[in-house]
């Protein structure tokens, strides 16, 4: 199934969090928090401005982003757990 977000929404796959610290301590599942970092899977065409023109989004598929702790709505697409969020929920793009 192919999914295309509408408007200024982006589809994000969370980046898996490390299960072991740098010091070698294994973090149990009960102590883990969901990561606030992910990879953009798909983007919508953009939001409309006051004149009715579509303004393209600043993020694109493949970007690694940071987002707020409570951002987005969890969805399942092709068996994958993903998030749909507005571009305004994206805090920034992680550049390598």
Curated annotation (Swiss-Prot):
Family to which this protein belongs: Belongs to the GroES chaperonin family.
GO terms for biological process, alphabetical: chaperone cofactor-dependent protein refolding
Subunit structure: Heptamer of 7 subunits arranged in a ring. Interacts with the chaperonin GroEL.
Cell compartment(s), UniProt: Cytoplasm
Classification via NCBIfam families: PRK00364.1-2, PRK00364.1-5, PRK00364.2-2, PRK00364.2-4, PRK00364.2-5, PRK00364.3-3
General function of this protein: Together with the chaperonin GroEL, plays an essential role in assisting protein folding. The GroEL-GroES system forms a nano-cage that allows encapsulation of the non-native substrate proteins and provides a physical environment optimized to promote and accelerate protein folding. GroES binds to the apical surface of the GroEL ring, thereby capping the opening of the GroEL channel.
Organism: Caulobacter vibrioides (strain NA1000 / CB15N)
Pfam family, one: Cpn10
GO MF terms held by the record: ATP binding; metal ion binding; protein folding chaperone; protein-folding chaperone binding; unfolded protein binding
InterPro entries per UniProt: Chaperonin_GroES, Chaperonin_GroES_sf, Chaprnonin_Cpn10_CS, GroES-like_sf
Identification of the protein by name: Co-chaperonin GroES
Main location (coarse class): cytoplasm
Induction (UniProt): By heat shock.
